[in-house]
Structure formats: C-alpha cells, structure tokens
Amino acid sequence: MFLAIDIGNTNIVLGIYDKGKLIKTWRMAADRNKTVDEYAVLIHNFFSFINLSFKDIEGIGIASVVPPLTPIFEQLCYNYFKVKPLVIGPGVRTGLKIKFENPREVGADRIVNAVAGYHIYGGPLIVVDFGTATTFDAINDKGEYIGGAISPGIGISTEALFARASKLPRIELVKPLSVIGKNTVSAMQAGIIYGFIGQVDEICARMKKELGGAAKVIATGGLAELIATDSRQIEKVDQNLTLEGIRLIYERNQAGN
C-alpha cells in the first residue's frame, strides 16, 4: 500500500492507496509543536479504524509547504514505517516542465496539483486550490506549468477582518440567501463569499484569455465546494487532486529507479 501525505499550513491530509486506488483519507491539524511520536500516535489511531498497520505501507510520498514539519514526517517514516519517503521538491522527477523564472520557488502543492490536473483533465488547465492561500496555477496544452497567481485565502482574510474590525462578530462561512445582507452576519457572509467568487471568476477569466480561451478550471481544497456552486468559471471540484499528484510523482520516480 502507498501513503500520500499532504502537509499544508492549516491541515495535513493523509491518503491510503491500494493498487493505485484511493481507499481512505484523513485530515488532521498542522501543529508545528507536535513531535514525531505524537504524530505517529494520531496516524496509528487513524489506521486502526480500517485495521491497517504501519508495516502494510510499502511506499510514502510527501508534499509539504511547511518546512519545519517536513523533517518531522521524514523521521516518522523512518522510525515507524521503516520506509524512506519521497519528499517532493527540486530534483524530483515530476514529468512536468516548469516554465517559471525560478522553478525552485514553486511550492510542492502547486506542482502536484498541476501534475494530477494535467494527467486527469488534460490541458490547457487552471487549477484553483483553496488553502491557507488561494492559488491559481496555469498549465498549457503541452502540459507545461507556466505560472499562476496567489491571493490570501478565505480563512486568513476573514481572520484579518475580525481582528481589525472589533465590532464585527465572528461568523460561520456559509452562503447567505441574498447578496444584499439584512443584518450584520448576512452582510459579512455576502461580502466574503460573493467577493471570493468574484475574485476567482475574474482571475480565471483573465488566465483563460492568456491560455487561448479554452482552458478547463478545476478546484480543490477545503472551501472549494462553497465557492464552486456559484462560480461561472469552476467546472469541477476534485478534493483528491493533491493526493493523486503525490501518488503519480512517486510512481514516476519508482519507474526511473
């Protein structure tokens, strides 16, 4: 079996693959203060739900955008799984040509999304990932990663609003019935949700134009469903895109050994 580990700033997502098929995913908070052993206990508990043990895992791939957590999970793989993980980064075979001024600046999450997106949906393609930051990544019809855009994510944007505007209450991020709010809560929900929908649609429309007008738009990440339902640009939500990219890159590197 194969274990894909997606380490983000807010959450860590685990995916178990059996013969190339995703059979289970789990999500846990990304905590830089946790030790190797503490994370091992959490993973062991997850595994116990499906009668899985550490020794069942034959390969591990890691995509991380949190440098302090990367060595913790590498050590966890050595200590508990007795497996050397593939950490996706510079020097790893991805099968993706990166046409970026400095390819090393492109985050592992964006690379794996691009790899999986092009493999599954073809190109030209735009991948929108709703994480701590909202990222937009463009892949042309040749399967080349040509760049993208990064904006503050919905979560950190709303946190900034709550922190700076002391009279505004904390709210649940749900779509209001109307864009014209009738109270403070619904007005905030309208501004945040429809504001982000507008941002996504505008950036994607401009990217499509630069890509030649026919690009597909695929979304992933925690709040993708919330935004996609009213977006004029997003065609599909694929919540397993990042895990699938980790698996694909791992397999490409195994094939080359």
UniProtKB/Swiss-Prot annotation:
Q: What does this protein do?
A: Catalyzes the phosphorylation of pantothenate (Pan), the first step in CoA biosynthesis.
| Record's cofactor remark | A monovalent cation. Ammonium or potassium.
Per its UniProt record, the required cofactor names are: NH4(+); K(+)
Entry EC no(s): 2.7.1.33
Asked if the record carries the keyword Ribonucleoprotein, the reply is: no
> Assembly and interactions?
Homodimer.
UniProt pathway annotation: Cofactor biosynthesis; coenzyme A biosynthesis; CoA from (R)-pantothenate: step 1/5
* Substrates-to-products reaction catalysed: (R)-pantothenate + ATP = (R)-4'-phosphopantothenate + ADP + H(+)
Q: Which GO terms describe its molecular function?
A: ATP binding; metal ion binding; pantothenate kinase activity
Q: Which family does it belong to?
A: Belongs to the type III pantothenate kinase family.
Keywords assigned by UniProt? ATP-binding, Coenzyme A biosynthesis, Cytoplasm, Kinase, Metal-binding, Nucleotide-binding, Potassium, Transferase
State the organism of origin: Carboxydothermus hydrogenoformans (strain ATCC BAA-161 / DSM 6008 / Z-2901)
**Upper lineage:** Bacteria, Bacillati, Bacillota, Clostridia, Thermoanaerobacterales
Compartment(s) = Cytoplasm
State the name under which the record lists this protein: Type III pantothenate kinase
Active site as annotated? 109
